[in-house]
Design a protein with these regions (language model features):
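Conserved C-terminal structural/oligomerization subdomain of aldehyde/semialdehyde dehydrogenase
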Residues: 9-157
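A conserved active-site cap/scaffold subdomain adjacent to cofactor or substrate pockets
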Residues: 1-8
Length: 157
């Protein structure tokens, strides 16, 4: 209720979230940045393709490229369309995006942190978990192999 009070908004006592309608997206709207509170922004769209384009624009302009996105749909064509276009390391379908940390219900690795890949200037684009905290030493011996030339590997041009 502190957020609502600070904004001069009165809420019912059983309110769980504040929904705010925005007219703009991306860098034109401060509320399109990551929000770490029970506030949700709402933006209408004409088609699913339009919604995906807005999501991508928002990620690029307001921050979040490489992080996590969410789509609520039962249409597998929509899932594939969004997966191919929204630049995120994790796209959650029909689940809240805080589940990106990897609960048993979605198959993502349980995380202590979330990597955003080179999109977000990170070294990895997966959930950082205990396997990333273990030092592994690798011993390499020479192999008896013929090394191909760059021309053989990549062609003449």
């Amino acid at each position: 209720y502190k957020i609502a009070d600070a904004a001069g908004i009165s809420l019912p006592k059983d309110a769980k979230v504040i929904g705010l309608k925005v007219d703009a997206i991306g860098s034109a709207e401060i509320l399109c940045k990551e929000i770490m509170s029970p506030v949700v922004i709402l933006k209408s769209y004409d088609t699913f393709e339009n919604a995906v384009a807005m999501a991508k624009q928002n990620m690029v302009e307001a921050g979040g490229v490489g992080h996590t996105g969410g789509v609520f749909t039962d249409n597998m064509d929509h899932v594939l369309y969004a997966s191919e276009r929204i630049p995120v390391s994790r796209l959650l379908i029909n689940q809240p995006t805080p589940d990106a940390w990897g609960p048993a219900t979605n198959g993502l690795a349980p995380a202590v942190s979330e990597g955003c890949g080179t999109w977000g200037n990170n070294i990895i684009s997966e959930n950082v978990n205990y396997t990333h905290m273990i030092n592994i030493s690798r011993t390499a011996m020479p192999l008896d192999v013929e090394v191909r030339t760059p021309a053989e590997v990549f062609g003449d041009k």
